Design a protein with these regions (language model features):
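Bacterial Sec-dependent N-terminal signal peptides
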Residues: 1-21
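Carbohydrate-active catalytic/glycan-binding domains of CAZyme proteins
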Residues: 19-325
Length: 325
């Protein structure tokens, strides 16, 4: 009888401890092959907009995922596809999204153009809902030319603290910044008359991202080849979105015990908190297909001087974080 009582107390204690442990997201956080994730928050929901990771001719749509807590994710399939964008035929990549004037603007690259005479580049979808469906906003690419050697892909829309919106983009080892018109129908020249300013830092390849913390502009990007194990994320800091950006170092990379090819990321900040998450893709151990990439999330921290602490990629992911509480 005493043994049964002791066992009951023990199991009740273990159950109490388990109830106190936060649920973890696990990594990857969504099922399927997805890369280049754009993470953001709309209302009390987290959203992720990734690239469908497949051969270019199969990349003819974009899916989205939403969650109230970083643990339970809902898939929103085909929020936009090439049937809605007549000039897009393949290689729909690296979505970036902003909400403005009660509309959601989904920026994406399509067709993987190799020179300015080809059809394709960076386009915009528009919807009155974050889960779409999105229709072609302009009926043509927003940007379809090479400037300063930058392939028009990997777009990021940066909303500065003065209210201005900038397009930061570029592949092939070059990155440009351009000020968007208020209605996103084109670009406004800077005071010197230049429309596209190159801000390429050392070792930049693709996948730019920018945010502001404590008055400093953090510029992040991916280095290495996306199909290899050494894909990684580095960063720089400056007092302006135009730099100059001097490379500080790598903050996200492979862990031979966890995964390889960790890169092409985005950053989520909890509103009103100095609490940060990095959303990125990586390749599971043992996978040799370049397109076998999965979307993951981990915490991102800063040291006392404001430098980013190198991220530890994990299998556990992050703890449940409900935005409504």
């Amino acid at each position: 009888m005493k043994i049964s009582s002791v066992c009951l107390i023990f199991f009740l204690f273990i159950g109490h401890l388990a109830a106190q442990q936060p649920r973890m997201s696990g990594n990857p956080i969504i099922k399927g092959w997805y890369a280049d994730p754009e993470g953001t928050i709309f209302g009390n929901q987290y959203w992720i907009y990734p690239t469908y990771s497949a051969p270019y001719d199969e990349q003819v749509f974009l899916d989205a995922f939403s969650s109230p807590n970083l643990v339970d994710w809902q898939k929103h399939p085909r929020i936009i596809d090439t049937s809605a964008v007549k000039w897009a035929h393949r290689a729909m990549w690296a979505p970036a999204i902003v909400k403005k004037d009660n509309h959601y603007f989904l920026f994406f690259a399509a067709n993987d153009i190799q020179h300015s005479d080809q059809e394709g580049g960076i386009g915009i979808g528009i919807s009155d809902r974050p889960d779409g469906p999105y229709k072609d906003y302009l009926g043509k690419p927003l940007l379809n030319k090479f400037h300063h050697g930058a392939q028009p892909i990997d777009q990021f829309v940066f909303h500065d603290k003065d209210g201005r919106y900038y397009l930061i983009y570029g592949g092939w080892g070059h990155c440009n910044i351009a000020r968007l018109k208020d209605d996103f129908t084109g670009f406004l020249p800077f005071k010197d008359g230049i429309v596209f300013k190159e801000i390429t830092p050392e070792d930049y390849v693709e996948g730019p991202d920018m945010f502001v913390r404590h008055g400093k502009y953090y510029f992040m990007w991916s280095e290495g080849g996306w199909g290899g194990p050494n894909y990684r994320v580095a960063y720089a800091m400056a007092d302006s979105p135009f730099g100059p950006f001097k490379r500080i170092g790598v903050i996200l990379k492979q862990d031979p015990h966890v995964a390889t090819g960790a890169g092409h990321h985005s950053v989520i900040k909890i509103p009103g908190k100095d609490e940060w998450y990095i959303v990125y893709h990586r390749r599971p151990l043992g996978e040799t297909d370049a397109n076998h990439r999965v979307t993951c999330i981990d915490r991102m921290y800063f040291d006392a001087r404001g430098f980013i602490v190198p991220v530890k990629i994990t299998r556990e992911g992050v703890a449940e974080r409900d935005l409504s509480k």
